[in-house]
Amino acid sequence: MNSNPKLSYAIAAILSSCAAASLTSRAAAAAADTEVNSEAIQEVTVTAQRRSENAQNVPITIQTISADQLKQLNIANFEDAVKYLPNVSFATNGPGQGNIFMRGLSPGSAGNQSQSSIASFPNVALYLDDQSVQFPGRNLDILAVDMERIEVLEGPQGTLFGGGAEAGAIRYITNKPKLNVTEGSADASYSVTAGGDPNSAINAVLNLPLIQDHLAVRAVIYTDHRGGYIDNVPSTFTRENTDNGTFRFGIGPTAGECPNGLPPGAPAKGLPNGVCVPLGLPVTNNLTVAKDNQNPVDYNGIRVSGLYQFNDDWSLLLQQSYQNMEADGIFAQYPIGSDGQALQPLQVTSFTPAYDKDKFENTSWTVNGKVAFVNVVYTGGYLIRTTQQVGDYSNYARGSYGDYYQCTGGPGTVAKTGPLTCYTAATDWNDWTRNTHQTHEIRFSTPYDWRVRGLFGAFYENFQIQDDMNFNYKSVPGCSPANLAVALSGGPACAGDVETNPLSTATHPGQRGDTTAFGEDLQRGYKQDALFTSIDFDIIPQVLTLTGGTRWYHYDEFETGSEYFTSTSCANHPNPCPAGKNLDAIGLRKTYNGFRSRGNLTWHVTPDILLYYTYSQGFRPGGFNRETGLSLVATGPDGVKQLFKPSSYAPDSLTNNEVGLKSEFFEHRLQVNLSAYHMLWNEIQDPLFSPSQLGNTTFVTNGANYRINGVELQLVGRVTQGLTVQGSLSYNDAKQSNDPCLTANNPASATFGKCITEIVNPAGILTPANAVFGPEGGVPAFSPKLEYNVRGRYDWAIGDYKAFLMAGANHVGGMFNQIDNGTTNFVGNPTTTLLRYFQPGYTTYDASAGVAKDNWTVEAFGTNLGNSDASTFTSSAQFIKSEVPLRPRVVGVKIGYKF
């Protein structure tokens, strides 16, 4: 190809003139910087590219919340922070039970039961400094005390932050010890919750130098109590003709009426006129656990760090963190109670105690040094986290399998002998987990002022989960010697207790309790090795820079343990009944490896205006599904099951193309950042659970592809002396780009190799199959089109006092809780924990005002001033429609002291 010399000369002239103008303006800016501009927007330093630099110079979309802003906005945890972060969604069932999503990259979310065993690994990385603390289904709930900042890095960060950063990364950056500085602070607050119990918090920080120029320590201690605000109101639970499992009794109506005088439920095989419950079944009540404001939560923690400066080049930072979180009750409201009664906002009907205990300790270390001209950083960490959670699962009794586990003597119950008998519906699930997470990373980098500069690193990670999860919804008595004798003599039947497989790896081996119907005692995790590099080349120094980087990764993933459930062979069987499945013998192991890369072109039009283009790739590892005896499901029209559930699922991937502007005007009094992106998310990891069609266990498979287009705007303005206005906005348009189907893979089925379109349900009726992957053009979960926030703060002096007034608003657009999976906004008896609901948009308002004098600060604050009870996460996770509402209006006072 012949080049056009005139065009080449024109391009060269334009770039040369831009470079000259840029260098000239840089010199002027440098001279101007010698004069302090008190009205300029404060520069924010981040380490998003593994080096300290001004956030305005980083060619990706970054949102930051500084230490001052964390205090000003009364942000204690991520649930408080997310309202100031457009394009970031947070689906949570309560404290310590959250999933974080960015830019609408979510297949949906569910309850926390079994998430440690079956959930995909997160696609948003969560970091405490340089230590990864992410976890499937329940990201670490870190109280944001004595933090330097929170960084939110949007878009794939796979090159520098690895597999968990497919959609982005969130980094909590702690304050580090300061040499030769003695300082400290203390804050205390008290507030009241509308319609709920009061809240209180105290924290204290001390920085203490021990050896001049060499050693300092920093410690923070905190306690935070948040009062409950959701009432567990008195209720009953009565088995109904319309329950999904009523067919198991084998009773039909007479002249269109059931024995209880009510219309029948849906027809079943052999019962074409509908199904009925028998008379005389027990009615369950919750009088022993009904309570007002039943969902308080307490955080207690301490963090101690020490910095030793060996010389000008080498230092060692050690940090130890402990946190204990204890929450009671349920953090959702039920629009409809367990017996179909309409409830008021902030009410539930729960029948068993519920609580969540979440404790972690984290040790981390960082060595900074220099060898000749090469900067060296070695960092590592070791996290130990344990959780113990119990949740009410009484509404499972209305599902397709509830009566199987809770009744005997019917043709579809676990034991078909003896009189027709049902037991209590008050049941729960109990999930104990232990997570260890060890990481090591070493990075070498050249001086940043070199024209060609680079970063090279190596990474090792060992991530393991132990999960002992028991679904305690079997109320049929266990087969103790006495119960078994009664059953064998013609009395009510019993069901033997389940146990782990004696040949498998088990955290808590042995027989489970009488009420355990199904569960798993398993271990899962991976080891990862990675190498990564990033190289910058200044095409025109200080003006035009080209960056390229890549990461090679290698995952060794495993799963071992035991799974067990109450089969019909447990009927009238001495405790324990036949042992659970041995996962060790299956050999669940997978290896994933490959490269993920990124590239940037950064153009400093002037020192205060930056344009960039970024190409980046992200990924997350695959995983394993439950391996029970129910792996063949979806009975077809010919009576043959059509689908072998996959034993594993593969990684999904994300490709991002992004352009952006970062700029400051009017002597750094106005900041305007704008970005636009086009992303392709392929073969997403899609969780499926449909007891009426696909069996009674959840599994994950690779499903649809999505195309995401969006824009994001961030504004900060120093309008007048003392007045700052800032806001941010995101618009996200995400659509499914293909139309896959669930394909029959059983060679014995007449539909083998074809899309599954019909399935015989547990009641024996042929029904249309749900389009579990959704149609082309469908939208993903937690992907609101529009989000924005705006706030203003005015600071002024009153004599010796410094006063401030701040107010803000936050809007979250409507969104769905699941992908378009063939289910609807259902209120009655959910057939799955993954029903799709629409969550309407909402707007909240906050305000604060205060004064400071010398070392003291006093302020009054209010959050959710409009007292909205909008749902932040709607689901059928506990077999009843539940909505996790915003915390009601909180009004309080905070006092601070620093020295």
Which residues does each predicted region cover?
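N-terminal Sec signal peptide and the immediately downstream disordered periplasmic leader
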Residues: M1-N87, D312, L316
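N-terminal periplasmic accessory domains that precede
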Residues: F78, G98-F101, S114-Q115, A165-A188, ...
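Short acidic/polar hinge/loop motifs at secondary-structure boundaries
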Residues: S114-A119, N123-E154, A204, G245-F247
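Transmembrane beta-barrel wall of Gram-negative outer-membrane proteins
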Residues: G195-A327, E361, R434-T439, S445-E461, ...
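Membrane-embedded beta-barrel scaffold of Gram-negative outer-membrane proteins
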Residues: N203, S364-S394, L610-S616, K641-L643, ...
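Solvent-exposed loop segments that connect transmembrane elements
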Residues: I230-D292, D328-F351, D392-N430, N470-D521, ...
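Gram-negative outer-membrane beta-barrel transporters
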Residues: G454-L455, L546, H678-L680, T701-D820, ...
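C-terminal beta-signal and adjacent terminal beta-strands/loops
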Residues: F471, G478, A809-F826, G850-F899
